[in-house]
Amino acid sequence: MQVTDVRLRRVNTEGRMKAIASITIDHEFVVHDIRVIDGNNGLFVAMPSKRTPDGEFRDIAHPISSQTREKIQTAVLAEYERAGELDQVTYEEAGAS
């Protein structure tokens, strides 16, 4: 499995979410709404999720293996850093469509 494309939108918010990404896997499958979060130990990638009726968040899609999770995180964070250096990222207000 290879991440063959990463699209990134930075968000202007006071919270910890810094960007929203979409990835393409093997030129065949797209996953939207992957979030770049500024955590206590640095940036990390959170997979798309939805809130359950009891208030918990459940992943909608997620990698099965830690190796696949690492590939996704590496690709998304590399694009986040690259785009930030080039300042070629679309910024939007959090919650904007």
From Swiss-Prot:
Keyword hit for Cell division: yes
SUPFAM superfamilies, sorted: SpoVG-like (SSF160537)
Sorted UniProt keywords: Cell cycle, Cell division, Septation, Sporulation
GO biological process per UniProt: division septum assembly; sporulation resulting in formation of a cellular spore
Cross-referenced Gene3D superfamilies: Stage V sporulation protein G
Span of the signal peptide: none
Keyword Protein transport included in the entry's annotation: no
InterPro entries per record: SpoVG, SpoVG_sf
Superkingdom assignment: Bacteria
Family under the similarity heading: Belongs to the SpoVG family.
NCBIfam families in UniProt: PRK13259.1 (NF009749)
Function: Essential for sporulation. Interferes with or is a negative regulator of the pathway leading to asymmetric septation.
UniProt-recorded name of the protein: Putative septation protein SpoVG
Organism of provenance: Halalkalibacterium halodurans (strain ATCC BAA-125 / DSM 18197 / FERM 7344 / JCM 9153 / C-125) (Bacillus halodurans)
